[in-house]
Amino acid sequence: DSSTSRGLGDVYKRQVILCALQVQYSLALNLQKDWLIDGSSYQAKVTTTDKELCLSNGLLSRTFILSPNVATIAFDNLMNGNAELRAIRPEAVLTINGMEYPVGGLYKQPVQNFLNNDFIEDMISCDTAFTYVSHTVGETIERFPYRPKQEWLSNKNPWPAPGKRIVFTYKAAPRAPEMIRNVTVKVIYELYDGAPILSKQIEVENQGKSSIVLNSFKSEILALTETAPKVHYGEPHEIRMLAQEPGTYTRNYRKSPAQTDAPREYIDRFTQLFVVTDYAMGGDMEAMKDNPAVRWVFDHPEYEATGIRYYGQYKPARLEVCPPIGPDYEITPGMTFRSCTAFEMLRDATDNERRGLAECRFWRMMAPWTQENPIFMHVRRSDEASVKAAIDQCAAVGFEMVIMTFGSGFNIENNSPEYMEMMKRLNAYAHSKGIALGGYSLLASRGAKTEDAAISRKTGKPATTREEGSRFGKSPCLASSWGDTYFGKLRSFLSLIHISEPTRRRGIS
């Protein structure tokens, strides 16, 4: 009857109000202020005890044990109280001259799906691992010089993003082979003020008398907690990137580590961690394939015995940051190799709107040049009269840049004196009108000689199709002598002309 309906309605309203109050109380309990609105109170700091070091900013914390070797023993989301780490892994892994060596880390964890202090007390250092020597604490430093174009910025952010920086130094173990005894490894962390963002990079320095080859590396390894069930583990779509056969990774996923290169919607189902490196490409249009150094793998065999099983299957619960190929880099005496930088952001929500706002903040802080958005016009011909006409049009209507587009005839590789003089005149004319001048240089989809082409891992010959590992047909390899010449010409042109250059670097095999 109506009275019963009203009674149920009142009960429902009270339940909704109670739930809302509980959510508000929970948020107030965890955070005094919403970091997306005002993150000024969340300052990065480093605290140390006799055996531990903690890097925290009130939103994210990462805790390290210092003895018997450095290892990450906690990775906590302070926004919701979640512990993200379930098992200890090495701080990094290097393959040098064909031999694999862990950096830091502890071993003999009896159970892999959770971690407690009793486990840690009984764990030991690997006798082949690079061993902790010292650490330094300081402020964040810029990864490279960056001069913002203030007139193009929609949001102004400091560079570098302020925060704290820790550098852990490791030496080879006493029983290590002679070839690596004079190798020093540095693991570098930066935690930033005002956001749950952490970055990590490794450096390998050869202080010996002989060259070594860094065949491959893993600069980050995190065994993470699983946050949501997923019945079907998905088929990786890594065929395009590595030219692998379908099913390569999932065919025997119980027997070997399997990588997923699935869409981000799938990855987001089981982790609150957003990860990207400066190897990323493609404008994030295909999120995982454009982020090739970030790998989500099934944590076998360690996790097999003690992990939680959903319908007899597992989700990829281990993060690894490593390039899919190589680098096979020769480090000569006195030289230092620097890896890509991994950026990790913990999320505090599952809804797309808040996650999207967090990613916007991430890019503004970590890559503030993404906020430089000039209003530009493409000019279809690069002869002097056409470019000047386009410059005049842009100046008249308030545009800020002219770009000599594909097929316009602009050739940044033309270093003839006549061409250089014409470009200098056009650049000076553009600047006199308050207009920046740029041009496209086609990199990948231009064809290549056989000796300069990117080689398919599948065929051993120049890649020509997506299945063979090429996005744009036969493409030049940047590691070839052609690549050295190409970039040398670009740098020479830009230094002589002082042109503003949005060089288009399309997907590389």
What kind of region is each of these model predictions?
Residues D1-Q15, I497-E501, R505-S509:
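Single conserved hydrophobic/aromatic residue that forms the stacking wall/gate
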Residues L29-V46, K51-L55, L60, A74-Y310:
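Polysaccharide-binding surfaces and accessory modules of carbohydrate-active proteins
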Residues L59, I202, G334, C394, ...:
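Conserved, mostly hydrophobic/aromatic
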Residues Y329-R347:
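Short Pro-Gly-centered flexible turn/kink motifs
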Residues N352-S408:
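An acidic-aromatic substrate-binding cleft motif
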Residues M423, G439-S495:
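Active-site-adjacent "subsite" loops/lids of carbohydrate-active enzymes
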Residues N373-E384, T405-M420, E468-F487:
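The substrate-binding groove and active-site-proximal loops of carbohydrate-active enzymes
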Residues E400-G407, T485-L496, S500, R506:
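Active-site groove signature of glycoside hydrolases
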